[in-house]
């Protein structure tokens, strides 16, 4: 059950529209970043910059508590960054590896990503249950995303 008091006592229809905004921004951002990355033939920073933006915005999100517009804006842009990096990111393995090595690396990346899909919500839920707040979990998420961006900066893939 959704507690409307946590959503500024908005009607369910208003909440629905607010929840639809981040995926819409992500759709636009992912399309634009993918197009830009292909046009410029550059992958690394087209992946790193959206991730870094998402990390910063998720880290700042707890500071927006009490301001609906800033909170929704922070999550809209953060979700956009979390999806915008994907086209450039998925082009990178085949730039460094070929054939079965590229296929194996993509499989490994997917497997590790699926582990993140399990551990992320588990840790976030544990932090919320332990502290009574999602703030620590959001900081954990922001740091995890920032580490991912840092890894991509230093990944030895030539000239990207």
Which residues are covered by each model-predicted region?
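Short, small-residue-biased leader/transition segments that mark boundaries at the very start
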Residues: 1-2
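Loop-to-transmembrane helix entry
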Residues: 9-24, 104-108, 136-139
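Transmembrane alpha-helical segments of major facilitator superfamily
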Residues: 18-26, 113, 144
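Helix-to-loop junctions at the C-terminal end of transmembrane segments
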Residues: 28-42, 128
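C-terminal transmembrane helical hairpin of 12-TM major facilitator-type secondary transporters
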Residues: 41-92
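Paired intracellular helix-loop junctions of major facilitator superfamily
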Residues: 92-103, 132
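Multi-pass alpha-helical transporter architecture, strongest
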Residues: 142-160
């Amino acid at each position: 059950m959704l507690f409307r008091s946590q959503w500024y006592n908005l009607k369910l229809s208003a909440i629905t529209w607010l929840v639809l905004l981040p995926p819409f921004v992500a759709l636009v951002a992912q399309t634009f970043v993918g197009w830009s990355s292909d046009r410029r033939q550059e992958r690394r920073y087209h992946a790193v910059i959206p991730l870094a933006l998402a990390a910063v915005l998720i880290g700042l999100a707890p500071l927006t508590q009490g301001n609906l517009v800033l909170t929704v804006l922070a999550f809209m842009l953060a979700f956009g960054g979390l999806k915008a990096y994907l086209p450039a990111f998925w082009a990178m393995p085949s730039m460094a590896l070929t054939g079965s090595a590229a296929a194996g690396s993509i499989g490994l990346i997917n497997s590790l990503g699926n582990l993140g899909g399990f551990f992320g919500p588990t840790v976030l839920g544990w932090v919320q249950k332990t502290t009574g707040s999602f703030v620590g979990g959001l900081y954990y998420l922001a740091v995890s995303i920032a580490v991912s961006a840092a890894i991509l900066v230093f990944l030895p893939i030539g000239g990207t």
